[in-house]
A protein has these predicted regions:
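A short, surface-exposed helix-loop junction/capping segment
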Residues: 17-27
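Active-site metal-binding core of divalent-cation-utilizing nuclease and nuclease-like domains
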Residues: 30-80, 88-89, 119-122
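Nucleic-acid nuclease catalytic cores
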Residues: 86-122
Length: 122
């Protein structure tokens, strides 16, 4: 894919991340710790010139502005896409809720949940 992830729409960026995740899955297959997949995805995206921050700390506030605590998203890509990595047999509702919590806390609109642990990439 030759699209520019810096200036393109979010769908182009998501396509690049999914494509890169699939390449990693074909190479590594399942069975590794999540951190291995996180590092692999961050590394390959950076090689493509895409900005990636790992274990990005997200602050959670109460409605009055009081800091309640922190969450850590696996990957923040181009400052506009949160990517949560899993290495489980299959995704469950709690995984989706976790990503949605990260999106609310960060006020970022878009997220991807990628599972490398199943018989096929999810």
């Amino acid at each position: 894919m030759n699209a520019d992830p810096h200036n393109g729409d979010i769908f182009t960026l998501c396509d690049i991340v999914r494509e890169t995740g699939f390449e990693i899955y074909k190479y590594l297959r399942s069975g590794h710790r999540e951190k291995i997949y996180e590092n692999a995805l961050a590394h390959r995206l950076r090689k493509r010139g895409i900005s990636v921050e790992q274990q990005q700390e997200l602050r959670v506030f109460d409605e009055d502005g009081t800091l309640l605590g922190y969450l850590k998203a696996d990957l923040l890509i181009e400052d506009r896409l949160i990517c949560e990595i899993k290495g489980v047999r299959s995704l469950v509702d709690e995984h989706i809720a976790q990503l949605l919590g990260y999106l609310r806390a960060s006020r970022i609109e878009h997220g991807l949940l990628i599972n490398f642990g199943g018989p096929k990439l999810e």
